[in-house]
């Protein structure tokens, strides 16, 4: 497990942060008709939520840690440490040695990259990530892909025993 305690970033953000998500899209060198078209889209579909990318060192609600991200996307943390993005199938390790696989992600169109909010095969969920900068976001009125963080089905959850029910599973 990682020896140093990293600051974990969640998907919790302020309304002000969301309101500035599109600021970088409007460059003066772009044609004004293009800018007007983008502004109309942004006004009609403002950002409503973010999903940070999970990496090595991301933590779960039940105390697990992503040990090795296998997606070839590398982030340099504030500490200078480099971590890889996690994806579907990567393992989360718990202090007692148990492991669980990441089973829900941003979907095929996003290379099955794991996110804060991704679920594991044991019903656990990734709750934070040590990287701050790379995220996906949703817009009002714009549906996400069907395979973007889908709800788990009972068949996808590895139950510890037959008499246990999992919260949040349909």
How does the language model describe each region?
Residues 1-170:
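Intrinsically disordered, low-complexity proline/glycine-rich segments
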């Amino acid at each position: 497990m990682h020896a140093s305690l990293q600051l974990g970033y969640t998907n919790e953000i302020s309304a002000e942060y969301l309101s500035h998500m599109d600021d970088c899209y409007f460059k003066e060198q772009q044609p004004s008709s293009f800018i007007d078209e983008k502004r109309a889209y942004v006004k009609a579909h403002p950002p409503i939520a973010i999903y940070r990318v999970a990496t090595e060192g991301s933590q779960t609600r039940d105390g697990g840690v992503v040990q090795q991200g296998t997606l070839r996307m590398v982030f340099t943390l504030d500490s200078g440490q480099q971590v890889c993005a996690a994806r579907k199938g990567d393992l989360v390790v718990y202090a007692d040695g148990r492991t669980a696989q990441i089973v829900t992600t941003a979907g095929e169109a996003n290379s099955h990259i794991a996110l804060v909010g991704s679920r594991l095969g044991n019903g656990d969920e990734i709750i934070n990530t040590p990287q701050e900068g790379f995220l996906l976001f949703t817009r009002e009125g714009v549906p996400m892909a069907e395979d973007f963080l889908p709800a788990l089905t009972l068949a996808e959850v590895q139950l510890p025993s037959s008499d246990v029910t999992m919260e949040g599973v349909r």
